[in-house]
Amino acid sequence: MFEPMELTNDAVIKVIGVGGGGGNAVEHMVRERIEGVEFFAVNTDAQALRKTAVGQTIQIGSGITKGLGAGANPEVGRNAADEDRDALRAALEGADMVFIAAGMGGGTGTGAAPVVAEVAKDLGILTVAVVTKPFNFEGKKRMAFAEQGITELSKHVDSLITIPNDKLLKVLGRGISLLDAFGAANDVLKGAVQGIAELITRPGLMNVDFADVRTVMSEMGYAMMGSGVASGEDRAEEAAEMAISSPLLEDIDLSGARGVLVNITAGFDLRLDEFETVGNTIRAFASDNATVVIGTSLDPDMNDELRVTVVATGIGMDKRPEITLVTNKQVQQPVMDRYQQHGMAPLTQEQKPVAKVVNDNAPQTAKEPDYLDIPAFLRKQAD
């Protein structure tokens, strides 16, 4: 008989909001009372830091900006972060995993976020960035700054999630207020952090611990996540399908993902066949050449509901490992066999193909992260 496992979680997770956009996103998370993480706000703007609800703040570049901000100049933002590398290092030390939230295109977020990531990686910390890209109406110059910032940031993070603000406009409609639109963007950032944090902080029958998260999230490249909640007899299949069809995953060829992290959250009525159903649904898109980590966690408040969270990482990277299925407990062999036998055609790679990758003429269908969409709850608001 399965018994709930008491979770001993020593992993330290820190969330760093860089610049105005990142600071707003972290402040939003603080107000939503996300558990199991420490929050920091980093900015060149002293006034913004005085007003924030984030408990721990770091002012950077006071000798350069005199506390007045970076003036929409990423070079100033970078120099400001360089000036206070020691303060950033002190804040990051002791963390096992760091989320960096920033809005790309401005001065501080664009210039300083890559420096924060660089410091984190120098400390050996698993580093994930969740950033927004500017609206098209903000101009080509700001968009160019954003693209440059994302390129630089990608050099220093393990996984990178980008959310184009224009997707908010398309999904929520032109009648949405500016405050509500940016609030929705903050919800996207919050969902990414909360979804991964809960994977390793909630106890369950099959825990996804920090080592599992590191295995998947360290597959360097672009990352996407989706989640689904359903109830009733077919709740497992419905929740899994919602997770993998979430707009965050839409328009992306997930067969190129090098890592897939799956967490099933339900009450004490979770059945073994429901675990298998989720596994069978995930296998329909998982590549042959991926690390798949599956876990379950228990939430007595879920009642009849079941939630599936899927994180796909390493998208767009060339080197891919042989498939590995990682769980904390043994899965029935038929399920294991099906994971190893099924997979979508891999992307064409400019390298020697690994075993099982024999389709050298397959068209490259993966799209750039610009095409990331908005989570299902936002799409439903527009319906």
Swiss-Prot record:
Effect recorded for R174D: Protein has decreased affinity for the cell inner membrane, polymerizes into filaments less efficiently than wild-type, the protofilaments no longer form bundles, still forms rings
PROSITE patterns to which the protein is assigned, alphabetical: FTSZ_1, FTSZ_2
Keyword Cytoplasm: yes
GO cellular component, one term: cell division site
Pfam families to which the protein is assigned, alphabetical: FtsZ_C, Tubulin
Induction remarks: Repressed 1.3-fold by hydroxyurea (at protein level).
SUPFAM superfamilies (alphabetical): Tubulin C-terminal domain-like, Tubulin nucleotide-binding domain-like
Any one GO biological process: FtsZ-dependent cytokinesis
Protein keywords: ADP-ribosylation, Cell cycle, Cell division, Cytoplasm, GTP-binding, Nucleotide-binding, Septation
Free-text comment on this protein's domains from its UniProt entry: The central and C-terminal regions are required for dimerization.
Subunit record text: Homodimer. Polymerizes to form a dynamic ring structure in a strictly GTP-dependent manner. Polymers persist as long as GTP is present and disappear rapidly as soon as it is consumed. Interacts directly with several other division proteins, including FtsA and ZipA. Interacts with polymerization inhibitors SulA, CbtA and CptA. Interacts with MreB and polymerization bundling-enhancing factor CbeA. Interacts with CbtA, YkfI and YpjF.
Protein name: Cell division protein FtsZ
